[in-house]
Regions:
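Initiator methionine at the very start of the polypeptide chain
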Residues: 1-2, 28
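Bacterial N-terminal signal peptides that target proteins for export
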Residues: 3-13
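Bacterial N-terminal signal peptides
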Residues: 14-21
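Acidic, glycine-rich low-complexity segments
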Residues: 27-342
Length: 342
């Protein structure tokens, strides 16, 4: 029995030594490029300083039992921790224009089956915060932008973002999950990049919140405090409906029908952008903008750009005594007012 006990003790010691070796790149008290990292009560804390820092977290190549922290985001590990010892991750950057991202190129490790909640926070400055981008596994992260004009890219999974002060942007790309966006202060934008296939998108008011729903993928974006919605529909015969958004914070919706992101050419497919008015008395102006039309006079202005002349813009006034004026739309887009071509 003595021998058995002795062997067990040696095994425990070996595990402890291995854990120490894993964390050997830099001690918890060390600062690398202004960044500290340490585990406390099961939470991996990564903290930036007041300068502009870049941080990436990833799994070790060839050994997914190790989480690495890359201060400088230059591809080298400055801190390493046993994955099994990490039950939550909190990244907090300081002042300055910082970048913090989850690099899941070696595997997913945030919001996975181990329930490892992850929060990525900026500070003052114009920060870039990015969740896992490549893995199919759900990676549900929470983002806190702080002050400054921040860019948050949630990536895969169902994410929650608190954008904070400043004029911030939340980015969504095809294949990602359903996200919750709290715009908070400033003029904030949701940038939604679709796919080069036929898509059906509907924007509706849910009390004071915007519900942005895409049928393909069953994607729901739930937003509050977001003033601008940029929808890049891309290729395919798309259908986008903008309902009455009275009560929400959305004042501008931009529908880009170009065939490619940043492109200037229309996609050649017949797209439909439907704008629904209110049951009150509406005064609506529909004006050509050189590549489509702008619809103003409702709670939310709608701008359709890079349209084909065969694309269709139905404007439905609904109930009430309404007035609609059109100008400069000939050859830009097919405008229908209450079903009548104008």
């Amino acid at each position: 029995m003595a021998d058995a006990t002795h062997l067990f003790d040696r095994g425990v010691a070996a595990v402890a030594i291995a854990a120490l070796v894993v964390a050997a790149h830099a001690s918890a008290s060390d600062k690398v490029d202004g960044v500290r990292a340490a585990i406390k009560q099961g939470t991996l804390y990564v903290k930036g300083g007041d300068g502009g820092q870049q941080v990436a977290l990833r799994l070790k190549v060839g050994d997914t039992s190790v989480i690495q922290v890359d201060a400088g985001d230059n591809g080298s590990a400055d801190f390493s921790f046993a994955r099994g010892a990490v039950h939550a991750i909190k990244v907090k950057m300081g002042d300055g224009n910082d970048s913090a991202r989850i690099d899941d190129s070696n595997g997913a490790f945030t919001g996975d089956s181990s329930s490892r909640p992850t929060t990525i926070a900026g500070g003052g400055g114009n920060d870039s915060l990015q969740g896992g981008q490549t893995q199919v596994a759900a990676q549900n992260e929470t983002f806190r932008g702080g002050d400054g004009n921040d860019l948050v890219d949630g990536g895969k999974g169902n994410d929650t973002a608190y954008l904070g002060g400043g004029n911030d942007t939340f980015r969504w790309d095809n294949g990602e999950g359903s996200d919750v966006i709290e715009g908070q202060d400033g003029t904030d934008t949701m940038l939604f990049n679709g796919a080069a296939v036929a898509e059906n998108v509907t924007m509706s008011a849910n009390g004071g919140r915007l519900t942005f729903f895409r049928t393909q993928g069953n994607v729901t974006m739930d937003t509050d405090g977001v003033e601008i919605v940029d929808d890049n529909a891309l290729g395919g015969a798309d259908s986008v409906t903008v309902n009455d958004l009275t009560g929400t914070d959305v004042t501008q919706t931009n529908i880009d029908l170009a065939s490619a992101l940043g492109g200037s050419a229309a996609d050649g497919a017949v797209d439909n952008v439907v704008v629904n008015g209110t049951n009150g008395d509406d005064n609506i102006d529909i004006t050509g903008n050189g590549s489509g039309a702008d619809v103003t006079g409702l709670a939310t202005a709608v701008s359709v750009k890079r349209a084909d002349p065969t694309d269709i813009l139905p404007v439905n006034t609904l109930a009430g005594t309404d007035h609609v004026a059109t100008s400069g739309v000939a050859g830009e887009i097919q405008v229908l007012v209450d079903g009548v071509l104008v």
